[in-house]
């Protein structure tokens, strides 16, 4: 899950991001409401949730929510604010926030509210992705491969790490499309991370090794000089 965090308090933003990353979220953190709107306007489909402070430079969190909803954007938003009066909460929710968390707060409550948003939103329900003989289960990071034998079907289950799962899923969602390593890094790593240029290749070696250990074919092919392609063709 990729989250857009919009928080101008440096210490708080760093603390929130650290906790979210430890929970396996991918986090893009910006400190300005106008910058956040640029991200959401141009690539909102890459995000599954936004955590937005109310008092921000540029656009306020309230204005950001209003712009989202005016455009019919249903991206779930958790509003953070030091304004804790009932009328403030009503104003935030009426502007389009899905939940409201008053500062100061403990991180456990923040995570609990994120989980609650996930339960309420159909788009967050884990959906098994299947293509050909390959199935991915987001609830447990499990890859299942069905191998056709002359007299029966054999099913192998392979446990992937979070990052391996993300790479396999991203390529599987874009079958027959060549995707560069830099594009994969841009999609799956945080904006302020600087992974080594060969990190995707290293992860691909691990994925292929796990498949080979189970005598399973790997549907991800390397296209020299261009990137990777998920294909069911031999």
Swiss-Prot record:
Induction data: Expression of the rrpa-rrpB (nrsR-nrsS) operon is induced 3-fold by Ni(2+) and less by Co(2+). Autoregulates its own expression.
Residue ranges annotated for the Response regulatory domain, each copy included: 2-118
A GO CC annotation given for this chain: cytosol
Pfam families cross-referenced by the UniProt entry: Response_reg, Trans_reg_C
Record bears the keyword Transmembrane helix: no
Protein purpose: Member of two-component regulatory system RppA/RppB, involved in the establishment of the appropriate stoichiometry between the 2 photosystems. It senses changes in the plastoquinone (PQ) redox poise. Another group shows this two-component pair, renamed NrsR/NrsS, controls the nickel-dependent expression of the nrsBACD operon; they suggest the photosystem-related activities seen earlier are due to the expression of NrsS (RppB) in the absence of its natural substrate NrsR (RppA). May accept phosphate from Hik2 in a possible Hik2/RppA two-component system.
Comment on protein domains: The N-terminal response regulatory domain inhibits DNA-binding by the rest of the protein, in its absence the protein binds specifically to the nrsRS-nrsBACD (slr0793-slr0796) intergenic region.
Description of how the protein assembles with itself and partners: Interacts with histidine kinase Hik2; may accept phosphate from Hik2.
Name of protein: Response regulator RppA
Gene that encodes it: rppA
């Amino acid at each position: 899950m990729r989250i857009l965090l919009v928080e101008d308090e440096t210490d708080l933003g760093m603390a929130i991001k650290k906790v979210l990353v430890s929970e396996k979220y991918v986090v893009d953190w910006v400190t300005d409401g106008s910058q956040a709107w640029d991200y959401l306007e141009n690539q909102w489909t890459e995000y599954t949730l936004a955590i937005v402070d109310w008092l921000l430079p540029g656009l306020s969190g309230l204005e950001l929510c209003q712009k989202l909803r005016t455009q019919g954007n249903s991206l779930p938003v958790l509003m953070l604010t030091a304004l804790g009066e009932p009328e403030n909460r009503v104003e935030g929710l009426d502007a389009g926030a899905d939940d409201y968390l008053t500062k100061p707060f403990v991180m456990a409550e923040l995570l609990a509210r994120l989980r609650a948003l996930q339960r309420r939103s159909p788009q967050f329900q884990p959906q098994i992705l299947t293509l050909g003989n390959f199935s991915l289960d987001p609830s447990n990071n499990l890859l299942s491969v069905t191998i056709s034998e002359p007299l029966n079907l054999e099913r192998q289950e392979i446990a992937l790490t979070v990052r391996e799962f993300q790479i396999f899923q991203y390529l599987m969602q874009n079958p027959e499309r060549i995707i560069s390593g830099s594009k994969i890094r841009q999609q799956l790593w945080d904006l302020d991370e600087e992974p080594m240029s060969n990190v995707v290749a290293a992860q691909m070696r691990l994925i292929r090794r796990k498949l080979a250990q189970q005598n399973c074919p790997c549907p991800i092919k390397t296209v020299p000089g261009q990137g990777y392609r998920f294909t069911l063709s031999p």
